[in-house]
Design a protein with these regions (language model features):
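RNA-interacting cores
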Residues: 1-260
């Protein structure tokens, strides 16, 4: 099963003012592309309780006076299910010469980057490669690139506690990885050894979502937990972590310190 992150480069098709967030508009556009490629798969994704998509917000420089014709932007789309790759690319290709609208702002598709090495944000792997990693780290740093939060009981928790982060990743891994590669439930014993975080409000159509951005270093003294956490940290680059990862939240990068 392949994991894929691809980047769609967009050009502004007119002068306009972009809303603070386009999370829902980007999600809707990706779903439309999927539907153009395979309506049945798009319906299954829409009805899924655990989204196989992780989406960035609109990446690019926003002028204070509004965007200008031709300004460059990008969207990163990560897929946790290899069955989505072909229909998504087919849907995007069918829109290649047409304007698309995000929050009433028109854009044209300039490029589609899907091969590693063609763009810094493009990545590819598979579940077998990740689970068979020979580089296990006891110290794992996760960088939270967009506001991140978690459900904790009936509340929303913005601080990325070890059990919330790695249970979120474990649940998503077990939902999409082949059965033979899935993990049992883990009673995490990891600790936060350092962090630099701030809260940030991501404006959504239904109101602001409060989440955390910054970095956290986690330490796992148990070798088996360190192994699983390393696998899940590498997976997080594709899956995101926490709530609303298909709406631009929980975008993650990871750094592992490998002991010699």
């Amino acid at each position: 099963m392949t994991l894929q992150s691809l980047v769609i480069q967009l050009g502004a098709a007119s002068e306009s003012t972009i809303p603070t967030t386009l999370s829902r508009a980007i999600h809707a556009q990706v779903m439309q592309w999927l539907s153009l490629g395979d309506a049945q798969i798009a319906t299954a994704v829409h009805d899924s309780q655990e989204s196989p998509l992780s989406l960035s917000g609109l990446i690019g420089y926003r002028r204070k006076q509004g965007i200008q014709l031709g300004d460059d932007f990008a969207v990163r789309i990560s897929l946790l299910d290899s069955n989505l790759i072909q229909p998504l690319l087919q849907g995007i290709e069918s829109s290649h010469n047409k304007s698309i609208y995000l929050g009433k702002c028109p854009f044209v598709i300039r490029s589609i980057y899907s091969l590693p090495g063609t763009h810094a944000l493009v990545n590819s792997s598979d579940y077998t490669i990740l689970v068979n990693t020979s580089q296990v780290s006891n110290d794992i740093t996760l960088q939270f690139l967009s506001p991140t939060s978690f459900k904790q009981n009936q509340n929303i928790q913005p601080f990325p506690l070890p059990d919330l982060v790695f249970n979120s990743l474990l649940r998503r891994w077990n939902r999409f990885a082949p059965a033979e590669l899935q993990f049992p439930q883990v009673e995490w014993q990891g600790l936060v050894s350092a962090f630099e975080l701030k809260t940030h409000a991501l404006k959504m159509e239904a109101g602001a979502e409060i989440g955390t951005v910054g970095w956290v270093k986690y330490r796992f003294s148990d070798p088996e937990q360190a192994r699983i956490a390393t696998i899940l940290a590498n997976f997080a680059v594709f899956s995101g972590v926490g709530r609303k990862t298909a709406m631009g939240m929980g975008q993650v990068n990871s750094k592992l310190r490998i002991k010699n």
